[in-house]
Structure formats: structure tokens, C-alpha cells
From Swiss-Prot:
Cellular component terms per the entry's GO annotation: cytosol
Binding residues for Mg(2+) 1: D315, E327
Organism: Corynebacterium diphtheriae (strain ATCC 700971 / NCTC 13129 / Biotype gravis)
Gene: ddl
UniProt xrefs under SUPFAM superfamilies: Glutathione synthetase ATP-binding domain-like, PreATP-grasp domain
Official protein name in the record: D-alanine--D-alanine ligase
Pathway: Cell wall biogenesis; peptidoglycan biosynthesis
């Protein structure tokens, strides 16, 4: 694949104009910034012309940071979008891909958008709807699949409907709380999560019901809908899925996350993922061939069940009785320590080649 891509990279071929959109209104704003910086650093400047677009915490679109080195975590401080000059994307299909300043002058007319946005208002189908209205090609999954993938309730319902193995959970809406019957069914420990969140933000592990109120309050700070999951005893595993340019799918080697029981959170939390300078996974996971093949097969089935496009990362617990699906991430992290680029590197597809595939797939879908 890399030979075919490089063959197109001749001096007379115009560069592909790519808008990298990052930041956003979600609690994963800073993770998105780091992902965007890593992507910009790996895009071949001979092949791509990059136009960064940042979205502030307040949702304002602005000309983004063009220096990837300024979108890194330094001394445990993560970057944020800094406002410079407001821009907006045309929603008129006759001017598809036009990014304009407030005075109507053109910032760029791009060929494709790479929305490196994590969490709500970026990974949940909202911005994908904007791209559909605009008519501009974009990397990743469409409106419905993004919305379902973002919402853990509907992810699990779709997985279960396809006969895929999922764990026990209870959904709480509004002011609802667990009943005594729920508590008996779930047992302890349980994990309390915002239903539409990621990067382990707002998640608590409850080992005693005296911890319940605090855990529920924390989750509701991030979402009015909360999912309470029975703990699954097993190792955490992540597997990447990539849609090739011809539409065929491939699954990466799986990664096994290191045991985090000794940590303060008791699970694979935000600090472990993004701030602590530690090795967090065994890649490839040390499973036998049969277990590895089953994880890859289930990852592809999950991707298809949600009608995903382009890419996804599928998370599992592997128990003594086999893999159990946990969730699917339709725009996984692309930070230097994110699992998605790492598992494909171990599969034989480097970071730059991975980006080439995703952009080409978006342009031809």
C-alpha cells in the first residue's frame, strides 16, 4: 500500500488540502489537541497541505496551531485551543470545503476534513451532520454510527442484538438511582460512568455502596445519563479496526493493558492514559492464536454492527470464559501513547501510512 501511495506523490500532483479539526466542547478537549499535534507531525508535507482549525471550550472555531510541537503535553500540562481568528465551514454544498473568516474572505478550500475530536459535540454525530450538510469528505464514521458509538447504552444494545457478548449494566436517566433489585443483580464492585463520555473521565469504581452517591454525582457532572456496569473479572484488551481504501476491513493485533489494580483509581484511568510516563500495554497481547483470532473477529463484527467507517477501536475484557465487549471508540486517540496507532504499528502499518489510508478512504467513500 505504501508503494502505491508514494507513486502518487509526484511534483506535478497537487497536495491534498486537509483541515485538521481539534479541541471542542467536551471534557476530552486537551486529548484532542494532543492527537491533532501528533497527526500534523506525521502527515507528509510533500503530499498534504494542512489547515488546522481549533474549537475552543466555548465552541468557537478559530484558526488553529500550525506548530505541532505546541500541541504536546509538557510537565503534565496538556494543551488547549487558543483563539486567534474566527473561521466557519460553509454548509452550502456548492462551496463544499470552504473555510471562511468572519468578513467572508477565504481561509482555505479543503479537500477533506480530519475531525480529531473526542467526546460530545465531535464524536457523537453532531459535527458529522455538519460535514454531511456541507458535502465535504471527512475521515471516520457517519452520523448515526457516531451517535450510537458515543452512547454506551445504544452501543451495548446493538452489540447484544447481533449476538455479541456484553456485560450486565443498568441505565439511569435524570434523577433515577439504583434500586435494591439492581444492586442485587449487579453485585459489587460496579463501575459508574457517564453514558456519553470517554478517556475515563467521570468514571468511578464502587467497591462498597457507601461510595455510591459520590460516584453517581461525579458521573452526572459529565452526563445526565449514567451507565452502571457490573465489574468483569479479566484483562483489558483493545483492538483496532481499519477500513482499507477498497472497503475491506482489517483488525490489528490486540493490546493487553497492564494491570492497574494497584493504582489510586483501580482502573485504567485518565492519568495513566495521558499523563504518567509508564508503559501501559503489552503489544501484541500475549494470547494464543485462537484467542487473538477471536478478538479480531469480534472487533470486525462490532465495527460492522454499528456500520462504522474508516476506523474504530474496540475494547474488551478477556475472561476465563472468553472475550466480553466493553465499548467501541469511533475516533480513537492519536496521541504518541494512544493504543490505536501503536497496535497498527505492531501490525505492520506505521503512523504515516495509517493516516494516508484514512484520508484516501475518506476521499473515495
Amino acid at each position: 500500500m505504501s508503494q502505491n501511495l508514494s507513486a502518487q506523490n509526484s511534483s506535478e500532483t497537487p497536495r491534498i488540502k486537509v483541515a485538521i479539526i481539534y479541541g471542542g466542547r467536551s471534557s476530552e478537549h486537551s486529548v484532542s489537541c494532543v492527537s491533532a499535534g501528533a497527526i500534523m507531525a506525521h502527515l507528509d508535507p510533500q503530499r498534504y497541505e494542512v489547515f488546522p482549525v481549533g474549537i475552543t471550550h466555548d465552541g468557537v472555531w478559530t484558526v488553529g496551531e500550525s506548530d505541532p510541537s505546541r500541541l504536546k503535553t509538557v510537565d503534565r500540562v496538556m494543551p488547549e485551543v487558543q483563539f486567534t481568528r474566527e473561521v466557519s465551514l460553509s454548509v452550502n454544498p456548492t462551496t463544499a470545503g470552504e473555510l471562511c473568516f468572519e468578513d467572508g474572505s477565504l481561509y482555505a478550500k479543503v479537500d477533506v476534513v480530519f475531525p480529531v475530536l473526542h467526546g460530545r459535540f465531535g464524536e457523537d454525530g453532531t459535527i458529522q451532520g455538519l460535514f454531511e450538510l456541507s458535502g465535504v469528505p471527512y475521515v471516520g464514521t457517519g452520523v448515526l454510527s457516531s451517535a450510537c458509538g458515543m452512547d454506551k447504552e445504544f452501543t451495548k444494545k446493538l452489540m447484544a442484538a447481533e449476538g455479541l457478548p456484553v456485560g450486565k449494566e443498568v441505565i439511569l436517566r435524570g434523577s433515577e438511582t439504583l434500586t435494591e433489585e439492581h444492586k442485587r443483580e449487579l453485585g459489587l464492585p460496579v463501575f459508574v460512568k457517564p453514558a456519553r463520555g470517554g478517556s475515563s473521565i467521570g468514571i468511578s469504581r464502587v467497591a462498597d455502596w457507601s461510595e455510591w452517591d459520590a460516584a453517581l454525582s461525579l458521573a452526572r457532572e459529565h452526563d445526565s445519563k449514567v451507565i452502571v456496569e457490573a465489574e468483569i473479572v479479566g484483562v483489558e484488551v483493545e483492538c483496532g479496526v481499519l477500513e482499507r481504501i477498497d472497503g475491506s476491513l482489517m483488525a490489528s493485533v490486540p493490546a493487553q493493558l497492564q494491570d492497574t489494580d494497584e493504582g489510586d483509581e483501580g482502573f485504567y484511568g485518565f492519568d495513566t492514559k495521558y499523563l504518567d510516563d509508564v508503559v501501559t500495554a503489552h503489544i501484541p497481547a500475549p494470547f494464543d492464536a485462537e484467542t487473538t483470532a477471536l478478538i479480531q473477529e469480534l472487533s470486525l463484527k462490532a465495527f460492522t454492527a454499528l456500520s462504522c467507517r474508516g476506523l474504530a477501536r474496540v475494547d474488551f475484557f478477556v475472561t476465563d470464559h472468553g472475550p466480553v465487549l466493553n465499548e467501541i471508540n469511533t475516533m480513537p486517540g492519536f496521541t504518541p501513547i494512544s493504543m490505536y496507532p501503536q497496535v497498527f504499528e505492531a501490525t505492520g502499518i506505521g503512523y504515516a501510512q495509517l493516516l494516508d489510508n484514512l484520508i484516501e478512504q475518506a476521499l473515495h467513500k
